Amino acid sequence: MIQVLLVTICLAAFPYQGSSIILESGNVNDYEVIYPRKVTALPKGAVQPKYEDTMQYELKVNGEPVVLHLEKNKGLFSKDYSETHYSFDGRKITTNPSVEDHCYYHGRIENDADSTASISACNGLKGHFKLQGEMYLIEPLKLSDSEAHAVFKLKNVEKEDEAPKMCGVTQNWESYEPIKKASDLNLNPEHQRYVELFIVVDHGMYTKYNGDSDKIRQRVHQMVNIMKESYTYMYIDILLAGIEIWSNGDLINVQPASPNTLNSFGEWRETDLLKRKSHDNAQLLTSIAFDEQIIGRAYIGGICDPKRSTGVVQDHSEINLRVAVTMTHELGHNLGIHHDTDSCSCGGYSCIMSPVISDEPSKYFSDCSYIQCWEFIMNQKPQCILKKPLRTDTVSTPVSGNELLEAGIECDCGSLENPCCYATTCKMRPGSQCAEGLCCDQCRFMKKGTVCRVSMVDRNDDTCTGQSADCPRNGLYG
């Protein structure tokens, strides 16, 4: 369903800018206040959906107008997504909540091919976007008389502490048959792999967030939304298979010694979790402070192994992006990726697999990471990530909306307010060329040569053909 929502955001012109404020993301020294005003263009008589499939936001950043394009992350959850918690008497309670109409988006800034965005629209707009090479955060302000939001640069958030944050993995990379350049991989969609991810939240996290399971759930969903974007350009699709919250106490000994915690968690996954929940990889999200400034640890090349397809990650920052990048890093180890060296590059940024986690983390993998990941996959051939899992949004509905594009169906119509596609027939509306895709804008193919995906490794950017809504893959992406 392609639905355009235009929200005009006006920049406040009084003393909020430049002052200091404590937000959910931390103590921010310089920020702007903006006010979303929704202007909806819907067909006459159409019903406003709770969360549109696509949205556009018009806003001012540093006094300049920009347009933020967002698209719902339809492949965020696997079909059998589940949530588990424990009652006060220790009973395991598992549900399969409906997550088809979720509120998590990814996107880009108009006329900025290097831009990215990861946004939650659950309660206002919360997340981050990159504009002209600078990372910005946005979140609602808790003001009773308005819908004010704060927008600020990530670098303007005060450091939570000065200690370096480290990954606990120390092994060196030993290549199988070294590939000299990432471009030698010649990856294409046939190489696509799929990781069904299960995240366990320990009791310390449950206590840290005052037993607010909804807040914990949203934090995890936001993290996976970020992780999915980073792995997309590696031809690896991340789907969230489930969440388990240890609400009545830890089921393993979570301790400051990260090797011991990782070992215990791996054993628990093998003997308990795998017997009751199908998934490919499990990550423990904990509030405990590990020894030696370590914030994460994982088994290198452990993917698909009952015990070793695991990692442990400290919830070390109020900024969800930083924790999400840490979990992306640890999952990278499970996929055979080692730490970057000085010769590795992802286009001038601090890359995901840096052994020291930056306060301004990157969502990009380096050229070395591509080589190591796909050398591992091609040589070790892990089987669990080969099969494409069903997604929540591929469930059949009375009016198509299932993305399968069966015979005779021209578009994924979804619902009645789709401006590009008839919901009753799943045929294109007159004048429409497309309904979705990186090279589709307002139901029309974007011009030939329009950059639709930026390569951070070899600068061989992907561009639209002018004949399709799809963005063809040419380059390699960090």
UniProtKB/Swiss-Prot annotation:
User: What interactions and quaternary structure are annotated?
Assistant: Monomer (disintegrin).
Any one GO CC term of this protein is: extracellular region
Q: Which organism is it from?
A: Crotalus atrox (Western diamondback rattlesnake)
Q: Indicate the segments forming the Peptidase M12B domain, all copies.
A: 193-389
UniProt keyword terms in alphabetical order: Cell adhesion impairing toxin, Collagen degradation, Disulfide bond, Hemorrhagic toxin, Hemostasis impairing toxin, Hydrolase, Metal-binding, Metalloprotease, Platelet aggregation inhibiting toxin, Protease, Secreted, Signal, Toxin, Zinc, Zymogen
In the Enzyme Commission scheme, what number(s) does this protein have?
3.4.24.44
Catalytic function, reaction form: Cleavage of 3-Asn-|-Gln-4, 9-Ser-|-His-10 and 14-Ala-|-Leu-15 bonds in insulin B chain and 14-Tyr-|-Gln-15 and 8-Thr-|-Ser-9 in A chain. Cleaves type IV collagen at 73-Ala-|-Gln-74 in alpha1-(IV) and at 7-Gly-|-Leu-8 in alpha2-(IV)
Can you tell me which residues bind Zn(2+)? Answer: 329, 333, 339
Residue ranges of the Disintegrin domain? 397-478
Q: Does the keyword Transport apply?
A: no
Q: In which tissues is it expressed?
A: Expressed by the venom gland.
| Remarks, miscellaneous | Pro-atrolysin-E can be enzymatically activated by venom, atrolysin-A and atrolysin-E itself. The disintegrin belongs to the medium disintegrin subfamily.
Question: What GO molecular function annotations does the UniProt record carry, in alphabetical order?
Answer: metal ion binding; metalloendopeptidase activity; toxin activity
Q: Disulfide pairs?
A: 304-384, 344-368, 346-351, 411-426, 413-421, 420-443, 434-440, 439-464, 452-471
Cofactor: how bound: Binds 1 zinc ion per subunit.
Q: Which Pfam families match?
A: Disintegrin (PF00200), Pep_M12B_propep (PF01562), Reprolysin (PF01421)
Where, subcellularly, is it found?
Secreted
Q: Where is the signal peptide?
A: 1-20
Q: Which family does it belong to?
A: Belongs to the venom metalloproteinase (M12B) family. P-II subfamily. P-IIa sub-subfamily.
Q: Which GO terms describe its biological process?
A: collagen catabolic process; proteolysis
- What is the designated name of this protein? Zinc metalloproteinase/disintegrin
Query: Any idea which residues are catalytic in this one?
Result: 330
Q: Which residues form the propeptide?
A: 21-187, 390-407
Q: Which cofactor does it need?
A: Zn(2+)
Sequence motif Cell attachment site, residues: 456-458
Under InterPro entries, the record lists: Disintegrin_CS, Disintegrin_dom, Disintegrin_dom_sf, MetalloPept_cat_dom_sf, Peptidase_M12B, Peptidase_M12B_N, Reprolysin_adamalysin
Where do the coiled-coil regions begin and end?
Answer: none
